[in-house]
């Protein structure tokens, strides 16, 4: 009886180890240098979405933009938490609305706010563009091994962006 219990316990431990710990063995314990740069870009990309939506909430007046801008702030906070965990610089901390460290995002902000200012439908189309951009970037990042906290944050952002895309597409 004792031998059977011990054998069952050993087999159970082996199965748990093989199934439960195998994914952790492949997960990175710290973001790579490339992932660090991607996170820093991503937090600014989320700021771009938030700032464009805040601009439209004021100038185009649709409740969707105000609601989704709040969600984008949550996305920024989530990525800011990951950056803080690894003591990485957050490029959005001292930036005013519509001001970006990344020059490409700065140009994109100017172009998108102008493009979406013509009417509500143009603004919604800009929302679709932004969310498609976010989704593509997030899917590319999620293809790589990464720390669990980073994967969790990116998965949440991806789900949020999919929901935002659906809201702007209605």
Predicted regions and their residues:
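Intrinsic structural disorder
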Residues: 1, 27-28
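C-terminal segment of classical bacterial N-terminal signal peptides
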Residues: 17-25
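All-alpha RGS (Regulator of G-protein Signaling) helical domain and cognate RGS-like helical scaffolds
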Residues: 28-170
